Amino acid sequence: MPQQKKEVLVFDLNKTFYNKSSKDEFFKFVVSKKPRQAKYYLQMLYYELLLMMHQIRKTEFKENFFNYLDNLPPSQVEAYAKEFWENEFPQNFNKELLNRFKVARDNGTELFCATGGLEVYVKPLFNLFPISGFAGTQAEYVNGTYKVMGKACKDEEKTRRISKHYGNFGFTIAEAYSDSKEDILEEAEKAFLVEDGEIKPYPKNSKT
């Protein structure tokens, strides 16, 4: 008898489930612990400008934006992230989405977060809100800095990572939520765009 496909609800993190941008908020938190890391602020603005001008790839942006984590080993970043998310969850998360996700999970739908954030600081969140799967931008700590492994977890890379997670089991994206018009919304049976906390049905083939 063939295995039944997993029914999956996929969601983005930043400005979708989490009301803010975790990369910016986590920087503020790290600076509160290590004030010297504030020296990276102007550098971060520079790389954001390059990204907006399409002068830098998303993977290269991720690797350079997170230079503020330099000389902080994974164990330290994870400890900071644990405290950070304990301060943020659940009060700074989209309450309607939180309720939707809980209902879906109780009904047997698997929850999967696919985000461009670095896994090293995002992962501790899901000790507070358990889900079935998670994919973020992977990085390794080499000589005091974080180097992105492969591609940033954006666009088609999200789909690839979800497929890798489920392997031979097969899956159907029953619902997808994001704050941007991305590939994953086109692939879902039901897709929703989150704009300033408001959840709106996403019309297919509207990605520009």
Regions inferred by a protein language model and the residue ranges of each:
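Short, compositionally biased "basic patch" segments
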Residues: 48-53, 59-74, 129, 134
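Residues within well-ordered alpha-helical secondary structure of globular protein domains
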Residues: 29-32, 83, 190
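Conserved alpha/beta cores of soluble small-molecule-handling proteins
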Residues: 35-36, 47, 56, 74-76, ...
